[in-house]
Regions:
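Short, charged loop segments at secondary-structure junctions
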Residues: 164-199
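Short, structured secondary-structure boundary patches
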Residues: 81, 174-183, 263-269
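An amphipathic, basic-hydrophobic helix/alpha-beta surface used to engage anionic
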Residues: 1-171, 216-220, 231-234, 238, ...
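Secondary-structure junction/capping motif
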Residues: 40-41, 127-131, 178, 199-203, ...
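A general structural signal for well-ordered alpha-helical packing
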Residues: 136-143, 182, 186, 204
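Short, conserved, surface-exposed binding loops centered on an aromatic residue
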Residues: 102-103, 145-147, 176-180, 207-211
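Alpha-helical structural motif
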Residues: 70, 84, 106, 178-185, ...
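Von Willebrand factor type A / integrin I
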Residues: 187, 191-281
Length: 281
């Protein structure tokens, strides 16, 4: 099949001439168009993706999630309530400790973050282009699996978009699970290329302030250095589910990686497409 990518079609080159080929004339006809070839999708056969409901929405470790941005009332303070939960205005009004009552939400978005920052691939062993393709295939396969399970899924790619003039914001698809969502994600992944981008740690810290609380964040990258590790730990400590997928033959975690396990962050290695089939988050 055609190789994944973003291709220009046209303009058509027209060549005319006499019967003997002594005189020829070249001219261009028509305009040009572009074609995006989607990436491969590998079926995740024995997925260990967490599922909250039969419909397939991913879950946090708790059966339900409380959204601290949605306060729906107050209740008397209970032993174990943190200071952030205390409703100080209501406490002052009643003379007794009162705690905030949060909206219960049963939905948790999945956010895929694919790192195609050229510098990170140059620093990792192995062929950069081959490793990048593996990362794109992993992202496409995970998105397909999650959306097939009716999980709201979003995508952010750190890299170059040949179809866009401004590369500053990366290639992004907002969270959704409509029928068109997979096509939108595959279209972005089809265009994505290695390129200049914001460093992964800075992106994680910036995105943390915008993600819905309790979201599942899947980071696909060829390497995790100490700065990225610190950002991942900060993300987990803030209440997000975090999974790291390292791609490429030389994918290694730093010596401090045992901290991931201590914080219950899953880490997987993908060296070949066959490894994608058994991915779990």
């Amino acid at each position: 099949g055609a190789r994944r990518g973003y291709y220009q079609l046209g303009p058509v080159l027209l060549r005319t001439g006499d019967l003997f080929g002594l005189v020829t004339r070249d001219s261009e006809g028509g305009g040009s168009a572009h074609l995006t070839v989607f990436p491969r999708i590998v079926a995740i056969r024995h997925a260990r993706f967490p599922s909250r409901r039969p419909a397939g929405e991913a879950r946090a470790r708790a059966r339900v999630l409380e959204d601290p941005t949605l306060i729906i009332g107050i209740r008397p303070y209970q032993h174990g309530d943190g200071l952030r939960r205390v409703h100080w205005r209501a406490t002052a009004h009643t003379g007794q400790l009162q705690s905030k009552l949060f909206e219960i939400t049963a939905q948790m978005d999945a956010h895929l973050l694919l790192n195609l920052r050229r510098q990170d691939y140059a620093a990792a062993p192995g062929d950069a282009a081959e490793t990048a393709e593996l990362g794109v295939t992993a992202a496409a396969s995970i998105a397909h699996h999650l959306l097939d399970k009716r999980q709201r899924t979003a995508l952010l790619v750190l890299g170059r978009d040949p179809a866009a003039a401004d590369q500053g914001g990366g290639l992004r698809v907002g969270a959704g699970r409509a029928r068109e969502q997979l096509a939108a994600i595959l279209s972005v992944l089809g265009r994505a290329e290695l390129g200049e981008a914001e460093p992964l740690p800075a992106t994680i810290r910036r995105e943390k302030d915008q993600l819905p609380w309790g979201s599942l964040v899947v980071v696909i990258t060829p390497r995790v250095d100490e700065a990225a590790l610190s950002a991942l730990l900060g993300l987990r400590a803030s209440g997000y589910e975090v999974s790291v997928i390292l791609v490429g033959r030389g994918a290694r975690l730093p010596a401090e990686a045992q901290a991931l396990g201590a914080m219950r962050i899953s880490a997987s290695r993908v060296v070949t497409e066959a490894d994608i089939r058994g991915l779990g988050i």
